[in-house]
Amino acid sequence: MAQTAMSETYDFLFKFLVIGNAGTGKSCLLHQFIEKKFKDDSNHTIGVEFGSKIINVGGKYVKLQIWDTAGQERFRSVTRSYYRGAAGALLVYDITSRETYNALTNWLTDARMLASQNIVIILCGNKKDLDADREVTFLEASRFAQENELMFLETSALTGENVEEAFMQCARKILNKIESGELDPERMGSGIQYGDAALRQLRSPRRTQAPSAQECGC
């Protein structure tokens, strides 16, 4: 029981989205990140799937609540409701499919319109292991990311390459924005919550200041 309690102790909770066309490997990326293995029997997501994981980002423990959204158009009205209050997102395309790359602008527009106004997005060119079938060059996607102020990585849900790094980079940037004051976890719709560990740190100075004030009055 003690180990379970310790494993659930975290400083911050971030709401994440995984968005992009159907067939880009979004569910496989989520499964690889959480389970550290490839999801062989992956079917198209119907509606929304959910996963969570606690990661260590520069000494802070961050719990990611990750919503994997369906990429098919018929589910868009359902999945859009989950965008609200997301702090971060993985915007995924398939490097072997020009069609999934061409759809990125629509997904990006939705994310920036419906999620937190300060949402941090990383572009992920998935299926890096299928380089021989590539239809989208690294340079082209890199330019798209730069033009739209996105971070960018190519990933492989099959081999695990850059999968954890994608989530880590996104979480690290959010954490940096909190520490610089650009993001306020207490603002409604930020997609960020303080965890128990952070709340204890926020309260502890008040407890230590009270006795010293009394001592001064004596």
From Swiss-Prot:
The modification Phosphoserine is found at residues 190, 204. The keyword Lipid metabolism does not apply. Regulated by guanine nucleotide exchange factors (GEFs) which promote the exchange of bound GDP for free GTP. Regulated by GTPase activating proteins (GAPs) which increase the GTP hydrolysis activity. Inhibited by GDP dissociation inhibitors (GDIs). GO terms for cellular component: cytoplasm; early endosome membrane; endosome; extracellular exosome; glutamatergic synapse; insulin-responsive compartment; perinuclear region of cytoplasm; recycling endosome. Its EC number is 3.6.5.2. Keywords: Cytoplasm, Endosome, GTP-binding, Hydrolase, Lipoprotein, Magnesium, Membrane, Metal-binding, Methylation, Nucleotide-binding, Phosphoprotein, Prenylation, Protein transport, Transport. Serotonylation of Gln-72 by TGM2 during activation and aggregation of platelets leads to constitutive activation of GTPase activity. Phosphorylated by CDK1 kinase during mitosis. It catalyses: GTP + H2O = GDP + phosphate + H(+). One of its GO terms (molecular function) is ATPase activator activity. Its cofactor is Mg(2+). It is found in: Membrane; Cytoplasm; Early endosome membrane; Recycling endosome membrane. A motif (Switch 2) lies at residues 70-79. It is a peripheral membrane protein. It holds the Pfam family Ras. Mg(2+) binds at residues 27, 45, 68. It comes from the Eukaryota. GO terms for biological process: antigen processing and presentation; neurotransmitter receptor transport postsynaptic membrane to endosome; protein transport; Rab protein signal transduction; regulation of endocytosis; small GTPase-mediated signal transduction; vesicle-mediated transport; vesicle-mediated transport in synapse. A motif (Switch 1) lies at residues 44-49. GTP binds at residues 23-28, 42, 44-45, 71, 126-127, 129, 157-158. The modification Cysteine methyl ester is found at residue 218. The keyword Translocase does not apply. Switch 1, switch 2 and the interswitch regions are characteristic of Rab GTPases and mediate the interactions with Rab downstream effectors. The switch regions undergo conformational changes upon nucleotide binding which drives interaction with specific sets of effector proteins, with most effectors only binding to GTP-bound Rab. The small GTPases Rab are key regulators of intracellular membrane trafficking, from the formation of transport vesicles to their fusion with membranes. Rabs cycle between an inactive GDP-bound form and an active GTP-bound form that is able to recruit to membranes different sets of downstream effectors directly responsible for vesicle formation, movement, tethering and fusion. RAB4A is involved in protein transport. Also plays a role in vesicular traffic. Mediates VEGFR2 endosomal trafficking to enhance VEGFR2 signaling. Belongs to the small GTPase superfamily. Rab family. Interacts with SGSM1, SGSM2 and SGSM3. Interacts with RAB11FIP1, RABEP1, ZFYVE20 and RUFY1. Interacts (membrane-bound form) with NDRG1; the interaction involves NDRG1 in vesicular recycling of E-cadherin. Interacts (in GTP-bound form) with GRIPAP1 (via N-terminus). Interacts with RABEP1 and RBSN. Does not interact with HPS4. Interacts with RABEP2; this interaction may mediate VEGFR2 cell surface expression. This is Ras-related protein Rab-4A. It comes from Rattus norvegicus (Rat). The lineage of its organism: Eukaryota, Metazoa, Chordata, Craniata, Vertebrata.
